[in-house]
């Protein structure tokens, strides 16, 4: 009789413990549905309070040339696949072409598609997953065609941002630090084009975002209402780069100020050989930072911009999943 009671008691404890475990780890499963992970968050959160995985030079997946790929290819998945894998920050860089279009570039290298390709894919994705938000960084990355008569920003504003085909796609609210509820189904602009007449998104002021080259830096944006904290030391070697990434992660972890915007680049410029290619750097940096994020648990990371987003090396944690699951 005593044995039966003991067995019953242990069974009850196991059931209770199991229920507690699954309840306590419910939010760990965000990355199990990467295509709509934002839909499971409190939509009262500001975007700056959400840990967001991003891709660096997001459009470089089109490169096939093996020589150019060593230093210019930073992604191997197309836009829609990146979105489905959980990426929500896209680093789009371009060049103004003679036909008043923006060609997507990585530096001098043309990536064989136009900005409209990204916007069309984002529009399609957000219509399928209307509770998600995409942050799009926009930057001029190469000199305009000699026949261009408008500035890069003017072309973007007139032919894309204000284009009836895309206008409802962009967040156009006045909140400098919008919530997820305000931006669902929208692209929020992260403006690296310089001075602008666009009054919504990050960098929405006359001076734009003042970006320091190859540096960890802080600057005020949106007429001083937000503090942008960036690590973009792309000329570092592995050890120094990892240290720089971890240093900004440590600051974000203990910072509860929603008006601080953390943008942390994991990318390193290639040295031009397979040994120090973007892929090789990513194969070491991504798993190392993923391990750190996992060890930190539910803690603020900010927005982490990575090479080869959605690519998992055998035996290592996937960095996109770890960023998603670190959300509280």
From Swiss-Prot:
GO terms for cellular component: extracellular region. Residues 41-192 form the PI-PLC X-box domain. Its main location: secreted. It is found in: Secreted. Induction: Less protein is secreted in a secG or double secG/secY2 mutant (at protein level). It is an enzyme of class 4 (lyase). The keyword Signal applies. It catalyses: a 1,2-diacyl-sn-glycero-3-phospho-(1D-myo-inositol) = 1D-myo-inositol 1,2-cyclic phosphate + a 1,2-diacyl-sn-glycerol. GO terms for molecular function: phosphatidylinositol diacylglycerol-lyase activity; phosphoric diester hydrolase activity. The active site is at 56, 106. Residues 1-26 form the signal peptide. GO terms for biological process: lipid catabolic process; signal transduction. Its EC number is 4.6.1.13. Keywords: Hydrolase, Lipid degradation, Lipid metabolism, Lyase, Secreted, Signal, Transducer, Virulence. Cleaves glycosylphosphatidylinositol (GPI) and phosphatidylinositol (PI) anchors but not PI phosphates. Potential virulence factor. This is 1-phosphatidylinositol phosphodiesterase. It comes from Staphylococcus aureus (strain NCTC 8325 / PS 47).
């Amino acid at each position: 009789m005593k044995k039966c009671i003991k067995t019953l008691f242990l069974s009850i404890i196991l059931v209770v413990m199991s229920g507690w475990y699954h309840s306590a780890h419910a939010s760990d499963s965000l990355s199990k549905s990467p295509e709509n992970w934002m839909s499971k968050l409190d939509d009262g959160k500001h975007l700056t309070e959400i840990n967001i995985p991003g891709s660096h030079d997001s459009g470089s997946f089109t490169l096939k040339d093996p020589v150019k790929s060593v230093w210019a290819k930073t992604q191997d998945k197309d836009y829609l696949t990146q979105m489905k894998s959980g990426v929500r920050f896209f680093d789009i860089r371009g060049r103004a072409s003679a036909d008043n279009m923006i060609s997507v570039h990585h530096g001098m290298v043309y990536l064989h598609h136009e900005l409209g390709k990204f916007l069309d894919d984002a529009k399609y994705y957000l219509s399928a997953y209307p509770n998600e938000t995409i942050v799009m960084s926009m930057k001029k990355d190469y000199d305009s065609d000699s026949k261009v008569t408008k500035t890069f920003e003017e072309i973007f504003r007139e032919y894309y941002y204000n284009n009836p085909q895309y206008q409802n796609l962009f967040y156009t609210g006045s909140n400098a630090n919008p919530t997820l509820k305000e931006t669902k189904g929208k692209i929020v602009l992260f403006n690296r084009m310089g001075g602008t007449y666009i009054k919504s998104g990050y960098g929405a002021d006359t001076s734009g975002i003042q970006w320091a080259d190859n540096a960890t830096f802080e600057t005020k944006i949106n007429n001083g209402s937000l503090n942008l904290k960036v690590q973009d030391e792309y000329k570092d070697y592995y050890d120094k780069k990892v240290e720089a990434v971890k240093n900004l992660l440590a600051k974000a972890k203990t910072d509860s100020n929603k008006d601080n915007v953390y943008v942390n680049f994991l990318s390193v410029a290639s040295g031009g050989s397979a040994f120090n290619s973007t892929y090789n750097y990513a194969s070491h940096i991504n798993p190392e930072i993923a391990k750190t994020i996992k060890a930190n648990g539910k803690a603020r990371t900010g927005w982490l911009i990575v090479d080869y987003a959605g690519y998992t090396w055998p035996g290592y944690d996937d960095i996109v999943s770890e960023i998603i699951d670190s959300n509280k």
